[in-house]
Amino acid sequence: MEYSAIYHDMDKRFCYAIDKDLFVIRVQVKKDDMKEIILHCEDKYIPMERKDTKKTILMKKIATSQFHDYYEAQLHMHLICLRYYFEFTDTQGEKIYYGNYEFYKECITNRDRMFDCPQNLREEEMFEVPDWAANKVVYQIFPARFAASQQVDKEQWYKAPISSMDDLHGDLRGIIEHLDHVQNLGIDVLYMTPIFKSYSSHKYDIIDYYQIDPSFGTTEDLRELVQEAHKRGMKIVMDAVFNHTGREFFAFEDIMEKGEKSKYLDWYYIEKFPLESERGEIPNYKCFGYYGGMPKLNLKNPEVEKFFTDVACYWIKECDIDGWRMDVGDEISHYFWKNFRRAVKAVKKDMLIIGEIWHYAGDFLEGDEWDTVMNYPFYLNMIDLLADEKIHVSQFVQNLGYLKGRLNKKCYPLMWNLIDSHDTARFLHLCNGNKKKQHLAAAFQLLLPGMPMIYYGDEFAMPGANDPDCRRGMYWDEEYQDKEMYEWYKQLLWIRKKHACISEGELIGSITKDEEETIVLIRKNVEETIALIFNCSSNAKNFSEYEGKYNLLRDEPFDGKVEGLDAAVIVL
């Protein structure tokens, strides 16, 4: 038994409430080390001689990463405080007990040697997420390039490669006019990158947080967009750029004008005067990524915190938006995010808060900051598996298992699974134009649990290299559209919505074969059992054990074969 691999903490990731009187307790162990894990629990305060409150629960393996297995027990309890410990039996028959961060050879009888779970505390800190969000489908729009309400010359609109200086006249009215496309695709949530006043096309260097950029439209246009989306059953998420501003933002302008005498000096991180931000040089004030045009805000300053929290609340009240995506969220303090969550949830309880972070985000996802994140670990694993072919299918599944094993159960169905975005090259570009690879990547994205985030144009196989070329004009003319890819996305989304088992069903089987480069995931709910088959090789593979069953993706009986870089959804 590998003692050093055993990990449990009485925190919001390994011991927490998911509902009134319903709790989750998890433990991490070495991969393939354990034959059985039993959770022992009892009431902390009721003496044994008065009442025997002991219970035992056989824990269930819920995820496997590259080096660890994760076990979980769910238990109903109605008491003041629970005491608990673990009984491990490894594959060699060795037995050990673990309580209060110590190992014991004998069963633990002293309650002071056990772990602690105070019920009220855990329930008061329970992770509450919007009821509407789990497993919904997101569509990301870059407003400057998605759709224009005015006529734009075709040569200008479809320019490739495109630069950050190209103006395609995209606007909110253009988005409104194309909502039917988004709805018909099967989208639940529309996420827009920033739309506030700025001189750039990307709008991440904001000048005025209370004004829609005139090139995009007006507050009334935004209000109409939200209303029209809501009529179609869609939610609207906007981009919150609170890590930094543009240089022309009033507070930084005041600093540039008045220097050390500016009353806004403490709104930023100024190292010395005069301010210097020569191209190619590191500015003498903190910025986003050393870009002098994006000075970093000091959100520890109560005035700054209040200003930007007020901005977030204002747009919720003014236009009834449904979520904020937090740009560069991991470079802003936990203190700010805790206060931010309380403020916006007080205005609209079912607001969705999404953080931008490119790695594991467990410390932001404990129920008191964000609801979810853009799942860049998913993106990176899709690149490694399909685009670069650097990992085998077993490692892909294990890497996703790390997230499932360590994240709160409430947020896992809300993870924004993406294969590209406005900050990356298009997936098709990373695959050197291999559409079959994007075809399979879309199947992974849309058939796994979470909130898949489709970047505008992926449904038409839009190409595009790294930023800014990944932000080309949307393919609205049929001559540019890949209709086969579009129908594939529609079919995947239709199946996902019609068969809740695909995204919400319990995973009861996972078969990965590295030599074949195939994955079979079997999910089950009260209505049906479904096998999701992914063939990551370039050659056809046989799955004769499912022959004759119905293949939802092809809408016909399964012939037992899955072509190279293809998928199947089989009703068992």
Predicted feature residues:
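Conserved, mostly hydrophobic/aromatic
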Residues: V27, I141, V182, M192, ...
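C-terminal beta-strand-rich structural cap/linker in extracellular carbohydrate-active enzymes
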Residues: K31, L82, F558-L572
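Hydrophobic faces of well-ordered beta-strands that scaffold small-molecule active sites
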Residues: V137-Y139, L190-M192, I236-M238, W324, ...
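Substrate-binding/active-site clefts of carbohydrate-active enzymes
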Residues: K136, F142-D188, I195-E318, F340-A346, ...
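Aromatic/acidic polysaccharide-binding cleft in carbohydrate-active enzymes
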Residues: A144, E366-D368, T372, P413-K435, ...
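The feature marks proteins involved in alpha-glucan
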Residues: M1-V24, E49-V138, A148-S163, D167
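Active-site-proximal helices and loops of the catalytic beta/alpha 8
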Residues: V226-M234, F249-G259, K317, D327-K410, ...
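Carbohydrate-binding surface patches
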Residues: V24-R26, S510-Y546
